[in-house]
C-alpha cells in the first residue's frame, strides 16, 4: 500500500518537472493531479452506479479538497493489500482519460494562461490538502473588494475614511458656509445672510472714508462706480447679501423686504383688501334687505342724471394764456405801461405834425400823441417842445371816451 502511493506521488511530481521549459505543456502537466484526486473520489462514490466521472471546478475542488483526501485515505486504509495494484492501474487509466478530455479545452482557451491558473488552483488544493485553512486567500479577496469599494465611494459623493480623518474637511466647510463675501480681495464665508450683511455693513461700507463710496462686489453692474451717498451704498449692498431686514408690521404676515420702499408698497395692500372685503360685505347686506332696494334704485337714477348733465369746462387753457400774453406784450410796446409806467401809467410820445407863426411872432408846433386816438393833438410853443417829447398819464386820468381803445380790460378796471 505504501509503495503504491509513493509511486503515484513520484509520477505526479515528475510530470511538472519534465516540461518546465514550455509554458503550455507545463500548464497541461500541472493540471494532471487535480482530476486524479477528483476522479478517484467520483469513482469511489459513483462507480457502483455506472455513471461517468464528472469534472469539478477549481473552487469546488478547493472547498472539498481537504475532506475528499481525508475520505480517500480512510478508504485506502480499508482496502486490502491485494487491491493496491488494481488501484494504481485504475488511477493511471483515469489520468489518461482526463488528459484526453482537458487537451481540447485548454487549446481553445489559450494554453499557457490556463496552465498558470491550473497551477495556482493546484497550489491552493495542495495547501488545503495539507490541512491549511483558506482564510488567507479569502482575506486577500475581501481586501481587494474593500479597496475597490473605497475607490468607488468618493465618486458617488459618500464619505470615505480619508474624509472622516480630516482630508475632506475643506469641502464640508465650504458646503456649510453657503454665503461667501464676493467683495474684492475678501474671501470670508458665512452661514447666514444676516451675518454676511453685518460683515458688509461693518467692514466694507462703514470702512470707506473720504465722502466717496463705491461697490467692489464682483460682477456688480455698478462695480467701482463712485457715489457720494453712504445710505445708497448700504441699501445697495442688501441686494448682494440677500438680507431682508424690513418685516411687515401687520400681524400674521411674515413678509420681509430688502428696502423700506418695498415694505411701504406692501403694507397698504392689507388695508385695501380689508376695505374691499368690507365693501363686498356691505353690498351683500344691501342686496339681502328688500326694503332698501327701492332706495338704491332711486340713488342710482339720481347719480345717473348727475353724470348725464353737461359739465362746465374751463376755457382758460394754454392757448388762451398765450393769446393774453401776446396782447399784453403788444400793449406794453405801445404804451410802456410795464416798462416805464410801473404798471399803472401810460407813456405817450409826441411828434410834430404842423408849425405856425402867430402875429406876435411866436412860433408854435402841433404835437400828435401815440398811442393814437387816446389824447387829442395840441399846439405848444416851440420852446416847450423838448420838455414835451414824452408825457406820462395815469390810467385813471385818461379820457373815458377813448381809454377803452387801449384795451377793453383797462376800461373795466378803472371805469
UniProtKB/Swiss-Prot annotation:
It comes from the Eukaryota. GO terms for cellular component: ESC/E(Z) complex. It is found in: Nucleus. Keywords: Chromatin regulator, DNA-binding, Metal-binding, Nucleus, Repeat, Repressor, Transcription, Transcription regulation, Zinc, Zinc-finger. One of its GO terms (biological process) is chromatin organization. Residues 1-117, 123-142, 268-304 are annotated as: Disordered. Residues 31-66, 87-99 have a biased composition (Basic and acidic residues). Residues 1-18 have a biased composition (Polar residues). A zinc finger (C2H2-type) spans 179-204, 218-240, 246-270. Residues 295-304 have a biased composition (Basic residues). InterPro entries: AEBP2/jing_C2H2-ZnF, Znf_C2H2_sf, Znf_C2H2_type. Residues 272-281 have a biased composition (Low complexity). GO terms for molecular function: DNA binding; zinc ion binding. DNA-binding transcriptional repressor. May interact with and stimulate the activity of histone methyltransferase complexes. PANTHER family: ZINC FINGER PROTEIN AEBP2. Belongs to the AEBP2/jing C2H2-type zinc-finger family. This is Zinc finger protein AEBP2. The gene is aebp2.
